[in-house]
Each structure stands twice: as C-alpha cells, then as structure tokens.
C-alpha cells in the first residue's frame, strides 16, 4: 500500500520522552504512513533506542538516521524534509505525543479526500510542572499556540484570519511536499527555526484545510532549549527575525505581513515582547544589563532598520501587551541615556 504521509521526528537528547511517544505512535493506523526519525548527534542513548524500536517493529515503515555531528534542530528539520518521498509530511517532536489513536487516520482520510497545500489540526497544550502535567488550554477554542480557525466554505480555512490568530510552530501541520519544496525555504536555525518559515509558507498557500482532530499533545518544559533564558536564545531570535523579513520579501509576502489593516505584524511583535520581557526574562536583562546590552542594541537596530518600531510600537493601543511593550521602551530609553553620557 502506497504511503501518503511521512511522520517526521527530529530527535535531540530524546531518550526520556521516547516511551511516551512510542506508545502514542503505536496506537495509530500506520498502514499509509512512514515514520522517519533523525537524531541530532549527541552523546546519549537516543539513537540506540530508536534503532531498537525500529527492529522490534519491522512491520512498520520506519527509518532511523543519525547526524555525524550536532548541528541543531533547524538543520535536522531540513534533512528530514529532504528524506520525504510521500505526497505529504507532518512534524511532531519526540517530547510531545499524539493526542488520540485517530490522528493519522484522520490525516490520511483528508489527503484522500482532496489535494491541499496545508492541513491544520487542533492541539492540546500541557504545562510540565514538577512531576505533573497540567492541561492549561484546549485549542483552538482560544489561542496560546493555535487560535481561532475560521472556515470560508466546507473545510477551507480563511488564510489571513488563520495567520493573524495563530503562532508560528511547524508541528501539527500536514504539509504538501511539492508545495513546500517549491518555496525553497530552509529552517537552519538552532532555535525558533519555525519563525522564518511559518509566515512565508502560509502566505504562499492557496488551499488550507481544517482537519478536525486533536493532533498533538504539546508539553511545555522549563528546561527545554527554547524556554531556557540565555544570551544565545535571544541572539537566535534576532537571527530568525532577520531571516523572516528576508523570506517574506523574497516570496512577495512582506506587504501583506506589514499591512496595518491585517494587523499581522503588530500581533507577532507584541507577542514577541512577551517572549523577551515577561517575568524572568525581564529580570534577566535588568540583572545582566552590562552583558546583555549588545543583544538589546542588536534588537533595536533590527527594529529600526526594518521600520518595525515605528509601525508597531509607536501606536497608542497595545492591548493586553501594554506592559511588555513598555518594558521594550524602558530598555530603549536606558540605552539612549547611556549613549548620551
């Protein structure tokens, strides 16, 4: 039976989570799915566990690869996409899992029903605290990572509405392989690799369908690479912002992205200010100002160069993001004051 979708699983120090992931995977109908694991080489037992899983389930279409050196999640995603031979692919991270046994079945049925560029699913988000996982939001009722899904007709998604109301995560999306490859987009970055890809990909899509199933259980961990507060984290973010605007410009989507009537750019940046200046992040910059000064300067250079500061942060109405935008302005004032002295 021909495989219709590849389940792409980028791995990095994933051994502690693989049992949960394997259990959710084995409940799926995998007759028309291929599973591809790619381990970003590091000194742990992840690759051996993956090889053992493949051997124990040789009735399934499982492929396991390991990089020669550690290159980061972006490079691994690029390599996974290059390995795809099916019409569609779907990213899921090994520290997450499938929500229920019907996820792949619903994906395959949607693929059989019609051709599409992107298929979006619902998610369940968990906050990992101590030894317990608390459900903090059922999506897409109201958005943390996935917001409202507005349908135009039948199962077709209103593209601009979806772009405006959803955050930039590449997991839990069924992606047409030919469509994606024609975009010539690459992930590359070690962190926040989704940001430069997500917007150009969605703006370029002609048909987005809604697959009415909860696809991924997403677990927010305070010790993950993307949540750890550090200088490399913020430098990576700035690099991703730079690449995002380049990608949008190259594929002709920049005008739509910055159009004030769409309010897409404004929402993106206000939510990014939460990433930069909420709670412990704000304290990090205050306590380590001498070390983080260059990072903040680089951020402001980018915002000014691309007109973001004037378009987004000079307007009066910042909504629920007011406090974080004020913190951005606070650091701008501090930097300008020090440069005058």
UniProtKB/Swiss-Prot annotation:
GO terms for biological process: enterobacterial common antigen biosynthetic process; glycerol metabolic process; membrane lipid biosynthetic process. Pathway: Glycolipid metabolism; diglucosyl-diacylglycerol biosynthesis. This is Processive diacylglycerol beta-glycosyltransferase. Activated by the negatively charged lipid dioleoylphosphatidylglycerol (DOPG) and inhibited by N-(n-nonyl)deoxygalactonojirimycin (C9J). Its main location: membrane. InterPro entries: Glyco_trans_2-like (IPR001173), Nucleotide-diphossugar_trans (IPR029044). Gene3D superfamilies: Spore Coat Polysaccharide Biosynthesis Protein SpsA, Chain A (3.90.550.10). The local lipid environment around the enzyme affects both the extent of head group elongation and total amounts of glycolipids produced. Processive glycosyltransferase involved in the biosynthesis of both the non-bilayer-prone beta-monoglycosyldiacylglycerol and the bilayer-forming membrane lipid beta-diglycosyldiacylglycerol. These components contribute to regulate the properties and stability of the membrane. It comes from the Bacteria. It comes from Mycoplasma genitalium (strain ATCC 33530 / DSM 19775 / NCTC 10195 / G37). It is found in: Cell membrane. One of its GO terms (cellular component) is plasma membrane. Its EC number is 2.4.1.-. It catalyses: a 1,2-diacyl-sn-glycerol + UDP-alpha-D-glucose = a 1,2-diacyl-3-O-(beta-D-glucopyranosyl)-sn-glycerol + UDP + H(+); a 1,2-diacyl-sn-glycerol + UDP-alpha-D-galactose = a 1,2-diacyl-3-O-(beta-D-galactosyl)-sn-glycerol + UDP + H(+); a 1,2-diacyl-3-O-(beta-D-glucopyranosyl)-sn-glycerol + UDP-alpha-D-glucose = a 1,2-diacyl-3-O-(beta-D-Glc-(1->6)-beta-D-Glc)-sn-glycerol + UDP + H(+); a 1,2-diacyl-3-O-(beta-D-galactosyl)-sn-glycerol + UDP-alpha-D-galactose = a 1,2-diacyl-3-O-[beta-D-galactosyl-(1->6)-beta-D-galactosyl]-sn-glycerol + UDP + H(+). It holds the Pfam family Glycos_transf_2. Keywords: Carbohydrate metabolism, Cell membrane, Glycerol metabolism, Glycosyltransferase, Lipid biosynthesis, Lipid metabolism, Magnesium, Membrane, Transferase. Its cofactor is Mg(2+). GO terms for molecular function: 1,2-diacylglycerol 3-beta-galactosyltransferase activity; hexosyltransferase activity. Belongs to the glycosyltransferase 2 family.
């Amino acid at each position: 039976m021909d495989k219709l979708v590849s389940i792409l699983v980028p791995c990095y120090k994933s051994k502690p989570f693989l049992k949960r992931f394997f259990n959710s995977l084995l409940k799926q109908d995998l007759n028309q799915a291929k599973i591809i694991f790619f381990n970003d080489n590091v000194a742990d037992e992840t690759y051996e566990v993956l090889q053992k899983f493949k051997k124990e389930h040789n009735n399934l279409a499982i492929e396991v690869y390991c990089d020669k050196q550690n290159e980061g999640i972006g490079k691994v995603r690029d390599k996974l996409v290059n390995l795809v031979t099916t019409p569609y692919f779907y990213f899921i991270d090994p520290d997450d899992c499938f929500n229920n046994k019907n996820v792949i079945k619903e994906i395959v049925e949607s693929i059989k029903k019609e051709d599409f560029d992107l298929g979006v699913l619902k998610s369940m988000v968990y906050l990992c605290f101590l030894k317990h996982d608390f459900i903090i939001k059922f999506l897409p009722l109201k958005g943390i990572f996935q917001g409202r899904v507005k349908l135009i007709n039948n199962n077709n998604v209103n593209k601009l509405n979806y772009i405006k109301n959803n955050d930039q995560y590449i997991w839990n999306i069924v992606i047409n392989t030919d469509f994606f490859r024609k975009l010539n987009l690459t992930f590359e970055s070690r962190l926040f690799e989704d940001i430069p890809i997500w917007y150009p990909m969605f703006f370029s899509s002609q048909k987005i369908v809604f697959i009415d199933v909860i696809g991924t259980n997403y677990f927010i961990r305070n010790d993950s690479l993307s949540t750890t507060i550090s200088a490399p984290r913020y430098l990576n973010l700035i690099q991703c912002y730079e690449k995002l605007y380049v990608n949008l410009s190259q594929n002709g989507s920049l005008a739509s992205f910055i159009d004030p009537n769409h309010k897409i750019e404004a929402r993106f940046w206000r939510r990014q200010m939460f990433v930069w200046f909420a709670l412990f992040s704000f304290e990090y910059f205050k306590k380590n100002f001498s070390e983080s000064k260059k990072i903040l300067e680089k951020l402001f250079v980018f915002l000014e160069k691309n007109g973001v500061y004037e378009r987004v942060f000079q307007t009066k109405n910042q909504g629920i993001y007011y406090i974080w935008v004020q913190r951005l302005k606070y650091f701008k004032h501090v930097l300008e004051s020090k440069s005058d002295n």
